[in-house]
Structures are given as C-alpha cells and as structure tokens.
UniProtKB/Swiss-Prot annotation:
GO MF, one example: protein-macromolecule adaptor activity
Entry's free-text remark on domains: The N-terminal domain probably binds unfolded/aggregated proteins; the C-terminal domain interacts with ClpC.
One record GO biological process: negative regulation of sporulation resulting in formation of a cellular spore
Family per similarity comment: Belongs to the MecA family.
Protein name (record): Adapter protein MecA
Oligomeric and partner information: Homodimer.
Function: Enables the recognition and targeting of unfolded and aggregated proteins to the ClpC protease or to other proteins involved in proteolysis.
C-alpha cells in the first residue's frame, strides 16, 4: 500500500488489487461483501492510525476513487471547534455533516461507494472529457487502430501497467464533437474502454510511447 501525506490532516492511500489479494481478499469480496470490504478498510487504517504518523480520532471525511487496478482513498481528519467550525475548510460542520462519517461508521460509506462502482460497466465510466483511455493485452491489437487513426490532430500515447497496455488519446484538438465520437467508436471496435486516468498511468505505469503513438505503430509495426 502506498501512503502519501497530503498535509497535516489528510492522507492519500493507494492499494492495488494485487496487494488486496495478498491480504487475503478478492475484488468481488470488497465490492459485494460489506463485511469483507469494511475489514479491508480497517486493516488499511490500522497501518496509519498511530500517534506518530496519523492519529485518526473523531469524525473523518473520506473520498474513494475506485479504478480497474486498485483503490485510492483520501482520508481527512475533521477537527471540530466549539463554534461548529472545522479546520479542514468547511465553515460550519452542521451544514456539511453529511460529508463526514464517525470513525466507527466510515466503512459503510466506503462500501456503498465501492458497490456502486462494482455495478457499473466500464464503458459507463467515461466522463465528458477530451482524454480517453483504452486497454488491451497485445501490442498487435493496436495495429488496426493505428491504421485507421491517421488524423494528426489527435494526440496519442502508450503505457503499460501490470501486463496491460493502455492507450491514451487526447481529442482536445479534434475538429468537431461529432468527429471525436466517430473516432472513439472506431477505437472501441478493437480496444476496451478503461476508467484508468492519465494521472494514475503517469504515476504508476511504464511509459512506452510518449507522443505520436499511432504514427509510431504504423511506422514500425504495420
């Protein structure tokens, strides 16, 4: 598990599904078995819940980003003052208390978010953005895509993470919205849409081709 201290009151935790399996859990268990998911959360919290490192006491706020390769959990302590103000940027705790969970109930919030993620199809996780990510197993799967994606206005890069290749396509310079959707449809004929973000790939993945992925594949593989 990777631990990053964002500031005095906030930690960012990231754990891959491989790490989760090493702890004796499966992806299906943490998505659909509330008890197992809660137990995993407490295991993670126990590792950081020390006075010297990050003493979790009282209400905390959590934010979960669940991806196909792991979980990113941001934990923030909510220090509540006598007048109801907090030290984490919320001016009035009563107005924002739905964003917080007592330390002994936070597992329920985690599980509800994981369950929602587990019920979603990956294609439904695309957001309205210029950057799309696709995954595939063999580099040969990229060749027919590269042959059809000859538009120089489309930026592309290639990453590898845990035996999967990830194609990142930036449609920001595409001429029209319709053309963007058409190109996306072409790529989806051969590759699988992924909810993995470019930021996570840059942080944990291996960069294979930083620029002009389609042009490079056509030149050396097609």
């Amino acid at each position: 598990m990777d631990i990053e201290r964002v500031n005095e009151n906030t930690l960012k935790l990231f754990i891959t599904y491989n790490d989760i399996e090493d702890r004796g859990y499966s992806r299906e268990e943490i998505w659909y078995n509330r008890a197992k998911g809660e137990q995993l959360f407490w295991d993670m919290i126990d590792e950081v819940n020390t006075e010297d490192y990050f003493d979790v006491e009282g209400p905390i706020w959590i934010h979960i980003n669940a991806s196909e390769v792991g979980l990113e959990i941001i934990v923030t302590r909510a220090h509540i003052l006598k007048d109801g103000e907090t030290l984490d940027g919320h001016s009035n705790f009563d107005e924002h208390k739905e964003m917080f969970a007592p330390f002994d109930e936070v597992g329920d919030d985690l599980l509800s978010q994981l369950t929602q993620f587990g019920d979603m199809d990956e294609s439904e996780l695309f957001m309205d953005t210029d950057i799309y990510v696709y995954k595939f197993k063999d580099i040969d799967e990229l060749i027919p895509v590269a042959k059809r994606m000859t538009d120089e206005l489309v930026d592309s890069s290639l990453f590898k993470y845990e035996n999967w290749y990830y194609l990142v396509v930036d449609f920001g310079n595409a001429d029209e919205e319709l053309n963007r959707h058409d190109r996306n449809a072409v790529i989806k004929e051969f590759l699988t849409p992924s909810n993995f973000t470019i930021h996570r790939l840059e942080e944990y993945g291996e960069k294979i081709m930083e620029f002009n992925c389609f042009e490079t594949v056509r030149k050396y593989f097609a």
